[in-house]
Amino acid sequence: MKRRTDPECTAPLKKQKRIGELARHLSSTSDDEPLSSVSHAAKASTTSLSGSDSETEGKQPCSDGFKDAFKADSLVEGTSSRYSMYNSVSQKLMAKMGFREGEGLGKYSQGRKDIVETSNQKGRRGLGLTLQGFDQELNVDWRDEPEPNACEQVSWFPECTTEIPDSREMSDWMVVGKRKMVIEDETEFCGEELLHSMLKCKSVFDILDGEEMRRARTRANPYEMIRGVFFLNRAAMKMANMDFVFDRMFTNPLDSSGKPLLKESDIDLLYFADVCAGPGGFSEYVLWRRKWHAKGFGMTLKGPNDFKLEDFYSASSELFEPYYGEGGVDGDGDITRPENINAFRNFVLDNTDRKGVHFVMADGGFSVEGQENLQEILSKQLLLCQFLMALSVVRTGGHFVCKTFDLFTPFSVGLIYLLYCCFERVCLFKPVTSRPANSERYVVCKGLKVGIDDVREYLFSVNIQLNQLRNTDSDVNLVVPLSVIKGDHEFNDYMIRSNESYCSLQIKALAKIHAFVQDTTLSEPRQAEIRKECLQLWEIPDRARVAPSPSDPKFKFFELIKDTDINIFSYKPTLLTAKTLEKIRPVLEYRCMVSGSEQKFLLGLGKSQIYTWDGRQSDRWVKLDLKTELPRDTLLCVEIVHELKGEGKAQRKISAIHILDVLVLNGSDVREQHFNQRIQLAEKFVKAVSKPSRPDMNPIRVKEVYRLEEMEKIFVRLEMKLIKGSGGTPKLSYTGRDDRHFVPTGVYIVRTVTEPWTMAFSKGWKKKFFYNKKTGESFFTLPPESIAPFHTCYYTRLFWEWGDGFHMRDSQKPQDPDKLSKEDVLSFIQSHNPLGP
């Protein structure tokens, strides 16, 4: 066998020459190295390669450059090289071509030494396009911004110590002058240098593509990932953010002693108004937080930015009633029209017992594309009208939150001053959910004072003036004299500090976005972490936004009643006869209601998806053929009653839902509560879902409930009326609280305590008390174990049937001997009533 060192195994001369040339290329170190050194390296390499492969033979040294070039293993495996990130194949290929770190390829190392830079092409810009003016330095150090933090601080204006201005004092406050369309000289409430710097930073983005700016903004804002979570939009999370920061003063207002003003067990609703706030994110949050214990009224401009109630996935939009001013649901919703302001005010007061709402939210804004620096001036009337609406519908002690923009002009600051006078406390606040690069901030007002009517009427007159001056060269430039504003030094100082603070914040945020546009590798590393912290702090579940899936009524019914015996729902009431009359001997335990038709169970799956069932297992749930809406997960015991209004040819008939009892209200199971409490909750629920602005919808009412010992009150409401289609024969009719009447079919009698408890009257204490027949215990307060839950009330109820044989008046047909008369029942009740006649 031939050895590798034999002459026959050596490379041919041609191959040796080729290797020599390769050695010359690989050994070259720089473009400036003399040719003699290259030749010397080539000679040494050739000599070495033309001899033996043995490491010990000849001891002829190779050129260092050539040797390094072919140390593929060290190049591939060395971790110290900045090229170690590349795989071994690419490194070997480069090594074979003679690559050495820090030098270029080529005979004289004339190749480029640095890696080819990534493309600086931005978005869809033309190849090589540079935006003149944008790429210049802003000379703003944005890197010293504070660390992102979920905890926020609130700085309130000092409490206003001056009296609320009256109409006489404000009579000459309004100043009309030449319309002003520049902002650069508005330096009364902000330093000139800061103002101009901010305007410059804003203007830089005028030439930038919007999509490019949005991408950079998304990467630059540490709070960007909060987004809308499972709500309709980001606005909902702004409200959640502010609600937490201000100690839930919107969704859980407190009284003067610091206790909750409203409890879920109370009969009072939390009323709110949402103006200029389509598509309704603020309202969706409030209704999600308070569920059916809140009722909202809304007015916004009709059109593409109207309320999107069908997109309220996390809350029941049935609890919200849009009203568009003059014309109601057919109005235009323009808040600058005085007629709309008055109409909305009257509507809200009529439906809140003339008290007004607990708080108003306003989030108005419109596109100012191309005129971003003039946003404050262009939005001045909108801002005024939102403030005016709040003073028109907020109840005494109520709250107000409204979006504002820059507040540099004396006009805007004057409006803030009027709020400062009308509310107990006021502050300007920018939540972390509001992007730092925009001029958006919120004025938050707490505790409306008494005696603000003159201010409201003054703002109303200013709005009329603004409407008259529209499309002219004149404008209202002042609503409060500068001397008055600056005369209140604490207010003036706060205003300047606030403006300059937000101005500095905005400048840094704009500079940061500018840097992120120029360097697309920059990003905020803590976005996900900050999002998690904020959601936990604000008590918002971290779940995706998903549209509610359609439900099968039977499946939903079993889901709501849980493990309750289905047979309970098929029980029929015990008829009240002479034989069963003894059951109502403990009269203090019973309540009664007038019936108008057959009892049914009604299931609400959201909107108009409403089904009824008569309680028999053999029957199915049937879609209700009425125009009404109910929140999902609602289960009621009802009657569908034909109500009548008027008599004769003008008589009108409408089908109404009458609630006898409630089981589940918008997911809240109330079956274990006392019957009286369930009826109170039913009345509260009906207030929340009623739509006074929609006369085309079938009404929902709660039965009037009477104490059994006061049953004679029912008969006061009974009279003979002519019913259209009855052949001219008067029929017995029961007139309800709303002046509508119906033909009664009988009276339901419901027991409110459960065995072995009963109710009695203490003559010594002159009080009712609860008595346990087994243990002999007695209490003046209601023992929880004595409460009759829904299923007990349902299967123990009695029904006093009135038919054609029922005798109440002499004008009616003769009495049926098998039926109890009015005198029979009333005399029995009176004889067993411990309270006396």
Curated annotation (Swiss-Prot):
PANTHER family: CAP-SPECIFIC MRNA (NUCLEOSIDE-2'-O-)-METHYLTRANSFERASE 1, CAP-SPECIFIC MRNA (NUCLEOSIDE-2'-O-)-METHYLTRANSFERASE 1-RELATED
Annotated function: S-adenosyl-L-methionine-dependent methyltransferase that mediates mRNA cap1 2'-O-ribose methylation to the 5'-cap structure of mRNAs. Methylates the ribose of the first nucleotide of a m(7)GpppG-capped mRNA and small nuclear RNA (snRNA) to produce m(7)GpppRm (cap1). Displays a preference for cap0 transcripts. Cap1 modification is linked to higher levels of translation. May be involved in the interferon response pathway.
GO cellular component terms listed in the entry, alphabetical order: cytoplasm; nucleus
Entry protein name: Cap-specific mRNA (nucleoside-2'-O-)-methyltransferase 1
BP terms from Gene Ontology: 7-methylguanosine mRNA capping; methylation; mRNA processing
WW domain span: 751-785
All copies of domain RrmJ-type SAM-dependent 2'-O-MTase, residue ranges: 230-449
PROSITE patterns to which the protein is assigned, alphabetical: G_PATCH, SAM_MT_RRMJ
Domain G-patch per the UniProt entry, residue ranges: 86-132
Disulfide bonds listed in the record: none
Originating organism: Rattus norvegicus (Rat)
Subcellular location: Nucleus
GO molecular function, one term: nucleic acid binding
Keywords: Acetylation, Methyltransferase, mRNA capping, mRNA processing, Nucleus, Phosphoprotein, S-adenosyl-L-methionine, Transferase
Compositional bias of kind Polar residues: 36-53
Region feature Disordered, mapped onto this chain: 1-67
In-chain residues carrying the UniProt-annotated modification Phosphoserine: S27, S30, S52, S90
Record InterPro entries: G_patch_dom, mRNA_Cap_2O-Ribose_MeTrfase, RNA_MeTrfase_FtsJ_dom, RrmJ-type_MeTrfase, SAM-dependent_MTases_sf, WW_dom
N6-acetyllysine: residues carrying this PTM: K107
The EC number(s) this enzyme carries: 2.1.1.57
Binding site for S-adenosyl-L-methionine: N233, C276, A277, G278, P279, G280, G281, F282, D334, I335
Residues forming the catalytic site: K238, D363, K403 (proton acceptor)
Catalysed reaction, written as an equation: a 5'-end (N(7)-methyl 5'-triphosphoguanosine)-ribonucleoside in mRNA + S-adenosyl-L-methionine = a 5'-end (N(7)-methyl 5'-triphosphoguanosine)-(2'-O-methyl-ribonucleoside) in mRNA + S-adenosyl-L-homocysteine + H(+)
Residues reported to bind substrate: K202, S203, V204, F205, D206, R217, N373, L374, Q375, N438
Matching SMART domains: G_patch, WW
